[in-house]
Amino acid sequence: MLLHHTIIDGRLYARGSSDNKGSLLSRYIAVDAYQKVLGKLPINIKFVAEGEEEIGSPHLMDFIRDNPEKIQSDGIIWEGGSKVVNGPLVVHMGVKGVTTFEIVCKEPKNHSNPVWRLIWALNSMKNADDYITVDHFDDSIAPLTEYERNFVLNNDYDEEAMKKMNGIDHFVRDLTGNALKEKLYTEPSMNIQGLYFREIDPVTGMPKSAAVKMDIRTVPNQEPEELMRQLRNHLDAHGFEDLEIIEGHSTLPYRGKPDSLLAKAVIKDVAEVYGMPADVHLMIPGSCGMARVVKATGIPIVHYGCMDDASRAHAPNESVDLDHYIKGAKLSVLVFQNFATMD
């Protein structure tokens, strides 16, 4: 799985070493170690290796629908996860959704510039304070339940570590404390992935068409189809009827709870392996196909892995700390043991 790698100062450098082949491999290692040292596994373990997560897992639900007997289980450990260097392991119970799309401006009339037209449209969709200004965009957002609010407000959030990891000196709107944590759980985000144009007109010196590729990280109750309808209505209402929206892939958001037997086993065993309590989150800003799997199967999911905040996932010099990696495999061994005896 990791064909070419380099080890420097206790870190293994290789593409996919942290996100997320490395975390998957650590669980294979845990199974192999358990069988060689302790013998027969105390539980049945199934592996599902799915290679389309980065494009929205378009065929995952087909596989689940066609193979219910292969999926049925008492719990799912989902792909990868992270920890703070010299800090706690992060355990996630859910994810934000993602909806991707393009907005295209084709050959505007009167020699107008399609790039500027897109910029003006984008300016109507989000303001300088990071609020999404698409009409009715947040109408359906599910507020935190009393349980979720208490959990979020009582949960530690290492702001300094997050600022250091992301190379910033403050958060958007200068948020801090509970307001910052609530934003993470209850606000969607809108991101520009790239803006491009095609074919410069030799007469006007302007591109003939332009497009912007975007994504929205969604929170519970936001549905991709409804968001695209709201965006279409917003553009039309602001004079951009000529702009075309091309929908891309999407995954749904899911806000879980740490109350399943699997979650309790993982959280307990993290403290034993790492010598400090797990940093538990109901959801993370990232996205994957977790929500659709939970909705289709009802199986509780826990998300942990072998990355840390120096791993540089999806980037050059991706790496994993070998000590953390070994502990991650040990954690899985303990989870196998303890989950088998919980009721």
Language model features with spans:
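Active-site metal-coordination/substrate-binding segment of hydrolases
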Residues: 1-46, 327
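A generic structural motif
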Residues: 18, 107-110, 216-224
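Short glycine/serine- and small hydrophobic-enriched flexible loop segments
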Residues: 29-36, 120-124, 216, 334-337
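Histidine/acidic-residue-rich, glycine-tolerant segments that coordinate divalent metal ions
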Residues: 39-114
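A short core secondary-structure module
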Residues: 62, 109-132
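An extended, acidic, His-containing surface patch that forms the Zn2+-binding/catalytic region
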Residues: 85-86, 134-209, 217-230, 238, ...
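Residue-level recognition of well-ordered beta-strand positions that form the cores
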Residues: 102-106, 124, 213-217
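A common structural junction motif
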Residues: 125-129, 232-241
